[in-house]
Design a protein with these regions (language model features):
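Internal maturation/activation junctions in enzymes
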Residues: 297-315, 319, 330, 335-383, ...
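Catalytic alpha/beta core of large soluble enzyme barrels
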Residues: 256-269, 276, 300-307, 382, ...
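A structural-propensity feature for long, helix-poor, extended segments
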Residues: 121-160, 286-309, 412-453
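Secondary-structure capping and boundary motifs in well-ordered enzyme cores
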Residues: 12, 30, 73-77, 91, ...
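Conserved, charged catalytic cores of large soluble enzymes
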Residues: 2-48, 128-142, 152-254, 328-361
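Acidic/polar, glycine-rich intrinsically disordered N-terminal extensions of enzymes
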Residues: 1-80, 86, 487, 500-522, ...
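Function-dense linear segments that define catalytic or interfacial modules
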Residues: 21, 26, 38-47, 55-128, ...
Length: 544
């Protein structure tokens, strides 16, 4: 593929316009107004000389602040952190305090990540009160139900992550926690709001240095346990999609806490997830990218000073760690525009070297305004909704599909629109590529090692983690055995901070459904409401 010119237009597609107006625009705003509101409010008190340059970068979608910035900046309660990372200890007081913090965090728009490993297992004796413990899973389910009934901003479902260590006695019940019956999956397919166990929570088994030592040492008393845990999770990844793995080894040992999408890590209770992403697809030169690394770092640092907090413990941890989550999006489009496949290359490595300089940049800007230097600065988020607005590929993901139906929540009702991926449309219409020839996540699903290898390679430049979903063929279509997949994956685990897989159709109510290009082409901008499993047009001209 020859080098392609990069997008220059600033006009939203119909679907991106719908999402922007529904989720982020304040009354009377257009996108440039939103960019000005967010950047001027957050940065002017700290770095006024950067406001004009950064506002233009956001207006042209070269930098995309996290969704909480777009939604909450300028509001009376401006909580602009995407997520909170929480601990719980094995006591009634700690559990009660956790539930209060969860409700407060969710109601102010933050996703929640919790590690439950400190709680004693189900059936263990409770000496003080007598009786036995319910174990961590019961409390995970309680948090999930809290999230079910809290609509963030009236439209956004609560986002929750639960982690449990591989050596916890309840880990096998945890692994099977989201084994939904066929009836439940069918109900989810008809109505995404239908009840299913833990349906608002992503779950991961946490692997640490002790796991790898036990797995490799036949003499270890935990050797068989480690193997059983690993292979049962692999089986679930390839069939039900959950749980995934979270990995904390070497210099990252002890950083077990995660945000809801798992790209931000910490060892400290009440830590934050503070996100914004550089859109590589709209950049022509490495020098421009380097400048955006500096601007984005300064913006997020200012955000740690601007954002209010849902409870006091967050302010204390934030002042100590001041974590930034400077991310990337549009990597796949950047690769295609330069004629590269979805794999490592020297040019991208040289750009990532500039990305890694955010550590030094953050320390320099922190000293200027008299705050602590961020302990870590880079995290690649999945950038789902923000990726829609940027109209490029999300995070490090390949192109999901050339065309699809995307479901979204509007109030309490589910709607969908046909979408031709903005990147795919540019390739089809401007460069005369055949839609069937564009490599997508579904094509790469047949070669999962390429996806895993690329994630492990990019992770070298990321001091937090990368949130990425490994799309796989449906259970009956996989061309590899569980053993082949598991052995391949194990070889990469020490170089990853986490891994999540999604076999096609493994859960009902998928938000994205792949459709042929011809089906979606010409049908964009029409909004459909799902009524009893059927589709009713509620806007535009209904031609399908």
């Amino acid at each position: 593929l020859t080098s392609l010119s990069l997008p220059s237009d600033d006009t939203f597609s119909p679907f991106a316009e719908t999402i922007y107006k529904q989720k982020y625009a304040q009354p009377g705003e257009e996108w440039r107004d939103t960019a000005r509101r967010v950047v001027e409010t957050v940065m002017k008190p700290y770095f006024p000389e950067l406001v004009e340059e950064m506002a233009d970068a956001v207006a042209t979608r070269k930098f995309m602040p996290g969704g909480r910035y777009l939604y909450a900046t300028g509001k009376r309660f401006h909580q602009t952190q995407n997520c909170l990372l929480l601990k719980v200890e094995d006591s009634r007081e700690s559990i009660s305090d956790l539930l209060e913090r969860v409700a407060s965090g969710l109601m102010t728009g933050a996703g929640i990540g919790i590690v439950w490993s400190a709680l004693r297992p189900n059936g263990a004796k409770v000496e003080g009160m007598g009786g036995t413990s319910t174990g961590p899973i019961a409390f995970m389910q309680m948090v999930n139900e809290v999230g079910r009934h809290i609509m963030q901003g009236g439209a956004r479902r609560s986002a929750i992550w639960a982690g449990l260590h591989w050596n916890h006695p309840d880990v096998f019940d945890f692994i099977r926690l989201k084994d939904w019956s066929e009836d439940i999956k069918a109900a989810k397919e008809k109505d995404f709001n239908a009840y299913a166990p833990m349906d608002g929570t992503n779950i991961s088994v946490i692997l640490d240095d002790d796991f790898f030592a036990a797995y490799e040492d036949p003499a270890s008393e935990m050797h068989d346990w480690a193997h059983k845990v690993y292979w049962e999770v692999v089986e679930h990844m390839l069939t039900t999609a959950e749980p995934g793995f979270s990995i904390d080894v070497g210099e990252n040992a002890g950083e077990h806490l995660r945000n809801a999408c798992t790209e931000v890590t910490s060892s400290d209770d009440n830590d934050i997830c503070n996100l914004g992403s550089i859109n590589l697809a709209r950049l022509n030169t490495k020098e421009e990218f380097a400048r955006l690394v500096e601007l984005g770092t300064a913006f997020l640092l200012a955000g740690t000073c601007y954002s209010l907090v849902p409870f006091e413990g967050v302010a204390k941890t934030r002042a100590k760690n001041r974590r930034l989550g400077l991310g990337l999006m549009g990597i796949y489009e950047w690769l295609v525009a330069r004629g590269y496949r979805y794999e490592q290359n020297d040019e991208l490595a040289s750009w990532l070297d500039e990305y890694a300089k955010s550590t030094e940049i953050a320390a320099r800007y922190a000293a200027r305004i008299g705050v602590s230097a961020p302990v870590k600065t880079r995290a690649i988020a999945p950038t789902g909704t923000i990726g829609i607005l940027a109209e490029t590929t999300t995070g490090i993901e390949p192109l999901f599909a050339v065309a699809f139906k995307r479901r979204y929540l509007k109030g309490k009702e589910w709607h969908f629109q046909y979408v031709v991926d903005a990147t795919a449309r540019r390739l089809v219409e401007k460069y005369n590529l055949d839609a069937d020839d564009i490599e997508t996540a579904y094509d790469l699903a047949r070669d999962p090692e390429r996806r895993i290898a690329f994630q492990a390679w990019v992770q070298k430049w990321v001091d937090h983690g990368i949130s990425s979903t490994l799309n796989l063929p449906s259970v009956g279509e996989q061309q590899f055995t569980h053993k082949e997949f598991g052995e391949m994956l194990y070889g990469y685990l020490p170089d990853l901070r986490g891994v999540t897989a999604y076999p096609d159709g493994s859960r009902g109510g998928q938000p994205l459904t792949v459709v042929p290009f011809w089906e979606a082409d010409g049908a964009e901008g029409i909004e459909y409401e799902e009524i009893g499993g059927e589709n009713a047009c509620v806007g535009g001209v209904c031609g399908v």
